[in-house]
Amino acid sequence: MRRVLTSAAVAAALALAVTACGDGSGDAGSSPAKSAAPAEVSGTVTWWDTSDATTEGPVFQEIIKDFEAKYPKIKVNYVNVPFADARDKFKTAAQSGSGAPDVLRTDVGWVAEFASLGYLAPLDGTPAVDKPEEFLPVPAASGKYNGKTYGVPQVTDTLGLLYNKELLKKAGYDEPPATMADLKKVALDVKSKTGAGGLALNVDAYFLLPFIYGEGGDFVDVQNKKITISSPQSVAGVKIVEDLITSGAAVKPALQDSYTNAETAFKDGKVAMIFNGPWSNADNLGGKVFKDNPDNFGVAPVPAGSAKAGSPLGGHDYTVYAGSKNLDASYLFVQFMDSAESQAKIAGKLGLLPTRQPAYSASEATANPKIAQWAKPMETAVERPWIPEAASLFQPLVEGYQKLAGGQTTTEPMLKDVATAYQGILKGWSL
């Protein structure tokens, strides 16, 4: 999965009138119909998978084959939709009442928004919510809205510092940097002593959050309905990024498709460190400098700022479209795809982190050493605000970050502009 949160999103979208699938109350189909006996369920389930089509999609399709073998009366229409396009594409289809999938692999930050618009079917009391006691609490919370379950957690993730052990060793370091100050020093030493770049940045809002969290900042203060993106703490965090760029500790960022550029440079050994998540494990291990030497691939928690080490909690949920004509089949599909057995298989083959506790101890998961490597980074994961407007907060910030990385602005005015944009999204919130 490539986490690139740059699809256009404006506040007006939140006020769109909901058509056939609901009235915008987030209470579509408030009492789900009693599910049919599994053996009698038939139909076709269209699933929009937003994972990486090359590295992840084939594994999910293997599990689909197992599902169809268990439920021969149900067929799955698998559609891979690029992550960057999926949010807007689903909203357009759901609003029109035509073309929406039965099941969507939904970013955790989209669930509250889609539920508030009436686009999602409530899942409580259906087979989709199976053995909820097994779920890790924070990933499970991402699927809740107004006290109801609209999504069940498929995978969880966060950001870590990924590093090339050999390049760090050549620069004189046996361990990765533990603080943001050390990050700059190590990156500059790698640059001067090895000829490789020290750090590559992904110019995307999600990837700014470890720097902001590290100084005690955040997008918003939900409890007090306050916009905090331009607070002194958030400013201090983004100033660290600005300094990494201007000092040369970070290579000059690509402003277009920066994710791919940073990832490719890391896999090819042209830079020593990047921030990325467990979804990139398979991609990285296929790279030139790691393919024949997987032990060279290091994973560590994001370096700590003056307040803490913190990176955003991410992941994906399975959600069911409220207007689906195949609800019973969709519930069974979600149940199967999200079982501990399926999660363990996904963890073993892709290194993606399960959301069910039993999956972590399953032999298929423990066979992949990357699962254990992500335990420490996950300890620093920060829960994001599960509010309907959450996904819309990324676009103004990424636009500002691009200007900052391109040298068109500096931290303080950039974040003031972002805060002003947030006032148009978060009606009634204070600065």
Stretches found by the model and what they are:
Residues R2-V18, G22-A112, V129, K288, ...:
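Conserved N-terminal structural module of periplasmic/extracytoplasmic solute-binding proteins
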Residues D107-T158, D182-K184, S192, F211-G214, ...:
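Hinge/lid segment of periplasmic solute-binding proteins
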Residues V138-A141, F297-P301, A347-E399, K403, ...:
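Long, aromatic- and glycine/proline-rich binding clefts that accommodate carbohydrate-like moieties
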Residues P101-D102, D130-L168, G197-L201, P303, ...:
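A structural signal for short loop-to-beta-strand junctions that line the ligand-binding cleft
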Residues A187-L188, K226-A254:
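Glycine-centered hinge/linker elements that transmit conformational signals in sensory
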Residues V111-Y119, P139-E175, V203-Q223, P312-T319, ...:
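Periplasmic solute-binding protein
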Residues A69, A171, K239, D243-A250, ...:
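Extracytoplasmic/periplasmic substrate-recognition and gating elements
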